[in-house]
Amino acid sequence: MSEITLGKYLFERLKQVNVNTVFGLPGDFNLSLLDKIYEVEGMRWAGNANELNAAYAADGYARIKGMSCIITTFGVGELSALNGIAGSYAEHVGVLHVVGVPSISAQAKQLLLHHTLGNGDFTVFHRMSANISETTAMITDIATAPAEIDRCIRTTYVTQRPVYLGLPANLVDLNVPAKLLQTPIDMSLKPNDAESEKEVIDTILALVKDAKNPVILADACCSRHDVKAETKKLIDLTQFPAFVTPMGKGSIDEQHPRYGGVYVGTLSKPEVKEAVESADLILSVGALLSDFNTGSFSYSYKTKNIVEFHSDHMKIRNATFPGVQMKFVLQKLLTTIADAAKGYKPVAVPARTPANAAVPASTPLKQEWMWNQLGNFLQEGDVVIAETGTSAFGINQTTFPNNTYGISQVLWGSIGFTTGATLGAAFAAEEIDPKKRVILFIGDGSLQLTVQEISTMIRWGLKPYLFVLNNDGYTIEKLIHGPKAQYNEIQGWDHLSLLPTFGAKDYETHRVATTGEWDKLTQDKSFNDNSKIRMIEIMLPVFDAPQNLVEQAKLTAATNAKQ
């Protein structure tokens, strides 16, 4: 076969970079393209309930496998996906957004086509996406199309940001040389400038050598930009106390003897706050300093000796080194840092949160107890997904087993995100290891935005655990403003009827209202095996919330009220 269609070329390239499931919806401008996915063995078209959920699913898949792809149709389809794409941009997640667009001739003639604004402007939606994309491409020439596809795939992966790729309907059936597939896409990072890199490393080593009370703080981009292994080795070699931010949950092993807890500024446990803020050197890996990630910007370091490791630059104290990538800096540091740190005398890390005290089995379930107890149910390798709201804050109180994947959307915070993200993560987990468990915690309010995607989970035989926290409405909003306001109320649903309503045949449902019911269920051997999809409704008091969320809500309300 000397030639293949451009559409097939796209899917072959995606398969080569380990993207095996593609998300999205069919539309008349992408139908011919979608035909080609079935020509590539090992590729799967998920077929979502709507484009927003598809974007969320692509985000969840990419967080596990490194990048993903969503395909939508021109105008109506692509715009429905943009909230999800914006979230991926904000949170550094590599999603390739492929849009089937009208033929080149139709665009040239400015035909008054459906799905347009009726003004002959076929570039308007492309322009809308540009500000939430690392780069964009609109294919117009079949001769350069393969190179453009390769560039878009590489950029998606390397930058961990969304990329927009427009494919006109008349080009996807045209042929390109098949031999192009024999040359893999270069997915490697370009080397750092040697002189700048040496200056950075020498400066860090000098700071490490002088430090008496250093700490390591792992944040979101530690996971997103693939330096988890380097960060773990950094902890092993130096024995510095290591902490995570809320967005960094899962980026380092929380069973490591040098793990000290979650740092969230003033919302941290007092001993964690003191340990981090009294440090004389902070090695901050992959920081994303958003309000909910920092306790409303309440970091209060006593030292100026802060080293920030970023994907595309380094910052040491007040000096910034553009273009110096943390991946290479960390790799080179690991060859010499043990010697620089040999004078360090390890200090004790903050004690782990003690186990819950024994209570009568009839005790009503509350969030503080539940999140602390959850660690007993989790297993090494689990994917734990926490929805914006009480779940995203409560999960900070749970100590993860090693090699746990943590997914939340602390920065973008689009409620309902995690239903779609769970679908994407479940596809990714199945491709890695069918026994890998995917566990969702979502509020009853958030679920109502994106519940349709449960039907896609059922369609594909995926087996996540769906924990629905039923506290009768939008609790996080109630805590911020309007505790009794009608706009924070929702219609109650019969959650345990949802799985059969969506057509599930092999499933389980449970309702848990007491500590005894929680322990009995989570300790059950068969329940711990991900043999079927499960929905577990957790009955909670209306205003019950993790204490750190209560405090964050006060800070957010104060910020909103400032003139």
UniProtKB/Swiss-Prot annotation:
Entry GO MF terms: branched-chain-2-oxoacid decarboxylase activity; indolepyruvate decarboxylase activity; magnesium ion binding; phenylpyruvate decarboxylase activity; pyruvate decarboxylase activity; thiamine pyrophosphate binding
Binding site residues for pyruvate 2: 157, 224
Modified residues (Omega-N-methylarginine): 161
Residues recorded with modification Phosphothreonine: 266, 336, 353, 522
EC number: 4.1.1.-, 4.1.1.43, 4.1.1.72, 4.1.1.74
Entry keyword Ubl conjugation: yes
Protein name as catalogued: Pyruvate decarboxylase isozyme 1
Naturally occurring in which organism (per UniProt): Saccharomyces cerevisiae (strain ATCC 204508 / S288c) (Baker's yeast)
Organism ancestry: Eukaryota, Fungi, Dikarya, Ascomycota, Saccharomycotina
Gene name of the record: PDC1
